[in-house]
Swiss-Prot record:
It holds the Pfam family Ribosomal_L22. This is Large ribosomal subunit protein uL22. The lineage of its organism: Archaea, Methanobacteriati, Methanobacteriota, Stenosarchaea group, Halobacteria. InterPro entries: Ribosomal_uL22, Ribosomal_uL22_CS, Ribosomal_uL22_euk/arc, Ribosomal_uL22_sf. Disulfide bonds: none annotated. Belongs to the universal ribosomal protein uL22 family. One of its GO terms (cellular component) is cytosolic large ribosomal subunit. GO terms for molecular function: rRNA binding; structural constituent of ribosome. GO terms for biological process: cytoplasmic translation. This protein binds specifically to 23S rRNA. It makes multiple contacts with different domains of the 23S rRNA in the assembled 50S subunit and ribosome. Part of the 50S ribosomal subunit. The gene is rpl22. Keywords: Ribonucleoprotein, Ribosomal protein, RNA-binding, rRNA-binding. PANTHER family: 60S RIBOSOMAL PROTEIN L17 (PTHR11593:SF10). It comes from the Archaea.
Amino acid sequence: MGINYSVKADPETTARGMLRDRPISLKHSKAIAREIKGMTIADAESYLDDVIAQRQSVPFRQHNSGVGHRSDIDGWDAGRYPEKASKAFLELIENVASNANEQGFDGNAMAIRHVAAHKVGERQGRKPRAFGSADPWNTTICDVELIIEQPGTDGVDI
C-alpha cells in the first residue's frame, strides 16, 4: 500500500521521511514545523538542541492563549520550549539526513522544503476522579512528514 505524502517530491533531488503515530502535541508540532521550514539540516538540528536545552524558545503564533512571553524571540512575544516534540523532530531530521546520505546527497547541507504535522487520532486514557468515577484523559497521536532538497532546486510540487 505504501505511505502517502501530502506533496509530490522529485526523488532525484529530494529525500524524505515520516514519523508515524507519535504521542506528541499537534499544536507544538505545528509551531516547530513552522519555525524549521527553510532551514538547513545542520541549522535545524542546532536549533532543536537549543530548544531542548531551553536556550532558544519556539514562537507560538497560533494556539498562544495563556502562553508566556519570551525575550529571545525576534518579532514575536509568545513562546515555549516543547521538549517532547523537539526530541521527536530531532529524531526525524537525523533519519531524513541519513536517508539523504544513502541516496548520495550531503544530508547536512540540504534544506527543509516541506514539513507538516497531521493529527491521526487519540490514544484513549482515563483519569480517576472522586467517588469512583473517571474522566477521559486522552493523548493526541500525530504523524509528521519531512522532505528535504538540495539548495537551488525545486523538486517539490506544493
